[in-house]
Amino acid sequence: TQSQTALMHRFNGIPFTTMSSPDLLKSLDAFDAREDDVLLVSYPKSGTHWLAQIIMQIYTPKVTLTSPIEFGDISRVEELNNLSSKRIIPTHLDYSMLPSNFKVKQCKAFYIIRNPKDIAVSMFHYYRDNPNLPTIDSWTIFLELFLRGDVVCGSWFDHFLSWEEHKNDRNILFLFYEDMKKDLPKVVKKMSVFLGVNISDSEIKEICEKSSFTEMKSNVEKENSDPNHTVCALTSNRKLIFRKGSVGDWKNHFTPKENKMFEEMFNKKMELSELAKRIIY
């Protein structure tokens, strides 16, 4: 459709919204990473905001949470270069598109994994509510697009596998959304150890309280939507970002037939993946 064409473009074969300009995407490979940069990597709707909220609290000295590296136009690069404080940089890029400087300098990175069925549902609602994304007529149509990788940021499977190839890199920590839901203090502790920051049990407790979904959602509703606060490359309206944050919502959307189709594709694509075996439905 016309709207589809106007709102999206492809770069390296991956669909991006026009909020990621081709000029910016082309320039990324020359991006100057710093050794103390921390990356928050995810496929959309995997819990990036939650992760960002926690990391900002683990670091008590001044750090800057930037908007995603691929969000905006070419002026973005200079903006990031001008930041004097430590940078926490979110991104939805797959591993091959990540600026090589981050790899050379072995910057620390978190990769958050969420059950892709829940991601598909969350993304479907997001497409419906977000004017920067094409209109999708129905859940059934959206699911087909999702499985084909014809959605923003491309195929979940490819994205996941591109990062999983680096699961033994010491500078990358893989986290599961569902583990965070189940035992957040344990995950926060793991994150702080990875970052080399000492925090007490009472500080962990406080971080978890401030990072509850309800707390984060109500904070966003109180704030004005400041585009500089977004860690989403698809919108600057933060109210669109928090919906349910639950585990297993896919069961309210998938028909048995759709579930079977999804499972077949998942099993085929993820046959050799170790991390995929740990995904909780």
What residue spans do the PLM features occupy?
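Catalytic lobes of large eukaryotic enzymes
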Residues: L147, G196-L240
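PAPS/PAP-binding and catalytic site of the sulfotransferase fold
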Residues: T48-P61, L175-I199, I207, E215, ...
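Generic recognition of short, well-ordered alpha-helical interface segments
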Residues: S155-D158, K186, S202
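Residue-level detector of flexible, active-site-proximal loop/helix-junction positions
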Residues: Y95, P116, D179, S211-T214
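PAPS-dependent sulfotransferase catalytic domain
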Residues: T1-L175, S225-Y281
